[in-house]
């Protein structure tokens, strides 16, 4: 110790009491990192009874002496000074310590817990400055029989503790399992004798004085390393004007320090970062203090694992939780598993928060990469349309108009995983209990109103499903779904949310994920620390635990019921015909709608015969895929009957194996729903006498026509249309549209838009409201073939909806890379650079394209590469697109051989008679008259309407032939039975 430190009063706090005359005092403040410096002070001129060393016994009254001093001053602020130092005993420092105005040495002597050591002749300077008062107080204590001077017979012997063998060092005689069995879950009183590191303490268990080492359950503090036996003790040098302890000193080893030194290795290993700070944190709170220990378990090395609780004023605190919350220990799963679930969750949550806040030992923590991302403020209400599996639903958003395909949102239930349904195309069978899980939700949710809280999205990895290289990333959206109108049986099965949750963010109702788990139809996903998870994760864990305890569903030892289903949709048509008699015998057959294949065609499951069939309405047809209103018809049917219980009557089966008949849902003929909405029409070729409730279907169709709904929006009642002049009557009823031509191709083909269609104005308004941003960053947006985007038309720089027709095979590397795009609302097609395309909002891209491909009926027009092809194309362009007129298009037939729309000239083609509103003859007849087209070849099996139309057109062709104009200038031309393919015209057209 520096000489200047003697005889100077310092301030500190009592950290530990090692005996009845010795304290460890730490500085109140310090200027360096880490724990404050400390001093070990023995009271000058006093000698308290000595505590037992290992294998020894106490001196009489040693424990009472130490306890008196411990209870008097532990954790309290004191003032002290060093009176003298004895080099012969490792430089031990002796001094005077005051608690407030009380001299602690005087209090100890006065109560008889220490005797006064008188100085020898050679040590006259090694004496307390209060020696006279101490001697007087000692004499009084002797006279009164206080403390060690007790005059009670046998008091000295009774004060000696009967110490059991120590459980530290040589633990051969210590029965850790027996101690645990006797005290499991019970709080045990103890006094902490030593802190080995932040999460390991050595304790006297009361009242037996069993000396044990306890590892704090669920946590692990940084290691203190291994130390040599020549340990150093801190020395104090005054460097503050107020006299606080602020430097280091050497002092004698305490009993606890000797215990640590005895187990130390001769090889020194440095401590981990924050180890010293964690140790001091624990010392400051529990060393030499009363604690309560709850034993949780014993590890394979016979070490005790327990929770340690201490008092902080009126509050009882958990040492392990405090260490973790302050970033001085980490959560340890293996020992936390011994604890109660609630305590374990608190530790885990505290560590996660410290990692997020980068506290202490987590300052440089970098969370592992995660493929999940939180979703904020995307809650909605809607109706369940489809149960995909036990953990995935499709919900129609109430905020989106009824019937819109954009209304449907796929929601995966957060933080749970149900058995997979498999994939019939890849010959993957459903996992055990997969069908049961889906059916369980189907019966409870289909058609029900639910509340959805979106919580996070996750990037789909290869483990989640097949991916193709270069394909755009796919994301799955997860959320919690609540059923407000749950049945009482279901409500009773799940844990009711606390009142605070109901008043806060949790909707009133049953959490569907919780219901799935309680029935044993799923497991809770064990997320990594920083992965997003359900906001109701704890409730899900509790539900899973209940299913495990009850051995329900996938947790039971029973195998799931085997089910063999005959799928006639993938079988030969002959097999379907074999089933026809058995289905016709039953008047109304209960069935479940498995899929909506189109507006009028479905896949049904018939439980009675465990069979799946393809089913279509008799005499009712919806627009085909790619045609206007086809998607809306599908959407309406999904909302109305998807996965619902229905009844069917089978009338016949077609050549493809599809059964034809009628369907009822809740006693309503489903076909009437489509007809009333203007999304289907009756087929006159199918005898009305063969259709059940045909009169209802006719009434529904008539109602839609009168209101001009959907496909009937341009319908004109009783209108007669001629290919030649207005006096020739077409008796067969045909659909008539009012249109404007937007693009002319060649070979008599062109694109039209419906005139006055409100959808056109709606989409134009949506596009006008968009804020077109700068070109996307290279690599952030990689559109592929078939994607709908925004593209800038080269002629007027307007932004329009477009479909990618061709795209670079590799990821985009330059803003000049070329994409061929098809403008789905106009029919134009051109090549544009990457810089001229943008991503499009799904709400704008969802509506079908407004441009409809058409071809002039009953005539053959030369292609652009043929003779008179350019003249024909120019004429058609002039009289249609160039005139700006409005036309009536009479649909003679629909050609679906073009398949889906993939670009210009593809998709369903309307074969039409086109006539301007103010003209007497059709464009078809006019082109024959100009000699730039010829009639189709007559066919013997053509229907009467077609023959009549050809008869009316023939006079116009004869007029051109006789005048030898156009293609007839050299006389008759050879008949060509084949239509020539149209060539594409450079982009242009109407805007």
Swiss-Prot record:
One Pfam family in the UniProt entry: SNase
Name recorded for this polypeptide: Ribonuclease TUDOR 1
Taxonomic path: Eukaryota, Viridiplantae, Streptophyta, Embryophyta, Tracheophyta
Modified sites of kind Phosphotyrosine: 970
Induction, as annotated: Accumulates after salt treatment.
Keywords carried by this UniProt record: Acetylation, Cytoplasm, Endoplasmic reticulum, Hydrolase, Nuclease, Phosphoprotein, Repeat, RNA-binding
Tissue distribution of the protein: Expressed in seeds, leaves, flowers, roots and siliques (at protein level). Accumulates in the cap and elongation zone of the root apices (at protein level).
Predominant place of localization: cytoplasm
GO molecular function: mRNA binding; nuclease activity; RNA binding
Role this protein plays: Cytoprotective ribonuclease (RNase) required for resistance to abiotic stresses, acting as a positive regulator of mRNA decapping during stress. Essential for the integrity and function of cytoplasmic messenger ribonucleoprotein (mRNP) complexes called stress granules (SGs) and processing bodies (PBs), sites of post-transcriptional gene regulation during stress (e.g. salt and heat). Involved in gibberellic acid (GA) biosynthesis. Essential for stress tolerance, probably by regulating mRNAs entering the secretory pathway.
Region entry Disordered, spans: 227-250, 971-991
Modified residues (Phosphothreonine): 980
Cellular localisation: Cytoplasm; Cytoplasmic granule; Cytoplasm, Perinuclear region; Endoplasmic reticulum
CDD domains, alphabetized: Tudor_AtTudor1-like (cd20443)
Entry's free-text remark on domains: TNase-like domains are required for relocation to cytoplasmic foci upon abiotic stresses.
Highest taxon of the lineage: Eukaryota
Domain spans labelled TNase-like: 8-151, 186-364, 378-557, 587-714
Gene source species: Arabidopsis thaliana (Mouse-ear cress)
Modified residues (Phosphoserine): 975
Null allele phenotype: Normal vegetative growth, flowering time and flower morphology. Reduced expression of enzyme involved in GA biosynthesis leading to reduced levels of GA-4 (e.g. GA20OX3). Slower growth in salt conditions. The double mutant tsn1 tsn2 exhibits severe alteration in germination, growth, and survival under high salinity stress. Reduced levels of stress-regulated mRNAs encoding secreted proteins. Abnormal stress granules (SGs) and processing bodies (PBs) assembly accompanied by reduced uncapped RNAs levels in heat-stressed double mutant tsn1 tsn2.
Sequence ranges assigned to domain Tudor in this UniProt record: 782-847
Family annotation (PANTHER family): EBNA2 BINDING PROTEIN P100, RIBONUCLEASE TUDOR 1
Activity regulation (UniProt): Repressed by the specific inhibitor 3',5'-deoxythymidine bisphosphate (pdTp); this RNase activity inhibition impairs subcellular relocation upon abiotic stress and leads to reduced stress resistance.
Residue list for modification N-acetylalanine: 2
GO cellular component assignments: cytoplasm; cytoplasmic stress granule; cytosol; endoplasmic reticulum; nuclear envelope; P-body; perinuclear region of cytoplasm; plant-type cell wall
EC number, UniProt record: 3.1.-.-
An annotated GO BP: positive regulation of gibberellin biosynthetic process
């Amino acid at each position: 110790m520096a000489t200047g430190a003697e005889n100077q009063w310092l301030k500190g706090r009592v950290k530990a009491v090692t005996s009845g005359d010795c304290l460890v005092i730490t500085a109140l403040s310090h200027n360096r990192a880490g724990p404050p410096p400390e001093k070990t002070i023995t009271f000058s001129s006093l000698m308290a009874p000595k505590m037992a060393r290992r294998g020894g016994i106490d001196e009489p009254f040693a424990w009472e002496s130490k306890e008196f001093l411990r209870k008097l001053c532990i954790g309290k602020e004191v003032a002290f000074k060093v009176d003298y130092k004895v080099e012969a005993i490792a430089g031990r420092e002796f001094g005077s310590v005051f608690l407030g105005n009380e001299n602690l040495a005087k209090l100890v002597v006065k109560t008889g817990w220490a005797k006064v050591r008188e100085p020898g002749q050679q040590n006259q300077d090694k004496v307390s400055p209060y020696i006279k008062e101490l001697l007087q107080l000692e004499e009084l204590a002797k006279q009164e029989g206080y403390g060690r001077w007790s005059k009670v017979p046998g008091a000295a012997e009774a004060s000696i503790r009967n110490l059991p063998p120590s459980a530290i060092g040589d633990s051969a005689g210590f029965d850790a399992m027996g101690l645990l069995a006797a005290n499991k879950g019970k709080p045990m009183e103890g006094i902490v004798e030593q802190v080995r590191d932040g999460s390991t303490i050595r304790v006297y268990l009361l009242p037996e004085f069993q000396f044990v080492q306890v590892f704090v359950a669920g946590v692990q503090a940084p290691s203190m390393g291994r130390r040599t036996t020549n340990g150093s003790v801190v020395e104090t040098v005054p460097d503050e004007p107020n006299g606080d302890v602020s430097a280091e000193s050497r002092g004698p080893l305490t009993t606890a320090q000797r215990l640590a030194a005895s187990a130390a290795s001769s090889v020194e290993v440095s401590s981990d970062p924050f180890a010293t700070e964690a140790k001091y944190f624990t010392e400051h709170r529990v060393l030499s203090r009363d604690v309560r220990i709850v034993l949780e378990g014993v590890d394979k090395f016979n070490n005790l694992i327990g929770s340690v609780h201490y008092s902080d004023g009126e509050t009882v605190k958990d040492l392990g939780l405090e260490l973790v919350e302050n970033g001085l220990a980490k959560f340890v799963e293996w020992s936390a598993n011994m604890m109660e679930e609630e305590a374990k969750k608190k530790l885990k949550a505290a560590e996660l928060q410290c990692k997020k806040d980068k506290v202490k030992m987590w300052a440089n923590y970098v969370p592992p990469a995660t493929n999940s991302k939180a979703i904020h403020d995307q809650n909605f209400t809607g109706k369940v349309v489809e149960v995909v599996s036990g953990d995935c639903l499709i919900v129609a958003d109430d905020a989106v108009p009824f019937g819109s395909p954009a209304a449907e949102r796929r929601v995966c239930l957060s933080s749970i995983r149900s058995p997979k349904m498999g994939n019939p195309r890849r010959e993957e069978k459903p996992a055990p209990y997969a069908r049961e899980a889906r059916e369980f939700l189907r019966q409870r949710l289909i058609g029900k109103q639910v509340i959805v809280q979106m919580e996070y999205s996750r990037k789909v990895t290869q483990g989640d499903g097949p991916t193709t290289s270069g394909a755009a990333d796919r994301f799955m959206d997860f959320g919690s779904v609540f059923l407000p109108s749950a049945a009482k049986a279901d409500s009773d099965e799940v844990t009711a949310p606390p009142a605070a949750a109901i008043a806060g963010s949790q909707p009133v109702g049953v959490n569907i994920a919780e219901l799935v788990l309680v029935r044993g139809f799923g497991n809770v996903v064990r997320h990594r620390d920083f992965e997003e998870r359900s906001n109701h994760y704890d409730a899900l864990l509790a539900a899973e635990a209940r299913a495990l305890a009850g051995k329900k569903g996938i947790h039971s030892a029973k195998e799931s019921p085997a089910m063999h289903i005959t799928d006639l949709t993938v079988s030969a048509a002959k097999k379907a015909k074999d089933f026809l008699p058995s289905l016709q015998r039953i008047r109304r057959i209960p069935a479940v709608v498995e899929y909506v294949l189109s507006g009028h065609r479905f896949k049904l499951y018939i439980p009675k015969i465990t069979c799946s069939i393809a089913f279509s309405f008799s005499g009712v047809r919806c627009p085909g895929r790619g045609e206007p209103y086809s998607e809306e018809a599908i959407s309406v049917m999904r909302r109305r009957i998807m996965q619902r219980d229905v009844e069917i009557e089978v009338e016949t089966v077609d050549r493809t194996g599809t059964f034809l008949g009628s369907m009822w849902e809740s006693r309503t003929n489903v076909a009437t729903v489509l007809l009333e909405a203007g999304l289907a029409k009756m087929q006159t070729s199918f005898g009305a006498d063969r259709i059940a409730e045909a009169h209802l279907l006719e009434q529904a169709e008539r109602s839609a026509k009168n209101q001009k709904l959907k496909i009937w929006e341009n319908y004109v009642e009783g209108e007669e249309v001629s290919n030649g002049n207005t006096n020739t009557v077409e008796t067969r009823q045909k659909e008539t549209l009012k249109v404007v031509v937007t693009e002319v191709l060649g070979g008599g083909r062109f694109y039209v838009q419906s005139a006055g269609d409100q959808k056109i104005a709606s989409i134009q308004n949506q596009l006008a409201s968009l804020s077109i941003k700068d070109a996307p960053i290279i690599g952030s947006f990689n559109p592929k073939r078939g994607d709908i985007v925004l593209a800038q038309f080269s002629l007027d720089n307007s932004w329009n909806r477009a479909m990618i027709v061709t795209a670079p095979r590799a990821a985009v590397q330059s803003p000049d890379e070329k994409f061929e795009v098809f403008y789905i609302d106009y029919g134009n097609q051109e090549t544009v650079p990457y810089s001229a395309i943008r991503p499009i909002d799904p709400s704008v891209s969802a509506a079908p394209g407004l441009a409809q491909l058409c071809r002039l009926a009953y005539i053959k027009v030369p292609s652009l590469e043929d003779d008179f092809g350019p003249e024909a194309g120019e004429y058609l362009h002039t009289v249609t697109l160039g005139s700006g007129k409005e036309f009536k298009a009479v649909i003679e037939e629909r050609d679906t051989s073009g398949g889906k729309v993939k670009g210009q000239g593809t998709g369903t083609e309307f074969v039409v008679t086109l006539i301007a509103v103010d003209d007497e003859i059709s464009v078809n007849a006019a082109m024959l008259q100009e000699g730039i087209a010829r009639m189709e070849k007559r066919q013997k099996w053509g229907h009467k309407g077609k023959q009549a139309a050809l008869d009316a057109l023939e006079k116009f062709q004869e007029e051109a032939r006789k005048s030898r104009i156009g293609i007839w200038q050299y006389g008759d031309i050879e008949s060509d039975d084949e239509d020539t393919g149209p060539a594409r015209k450079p982009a242009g057209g109407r805007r």
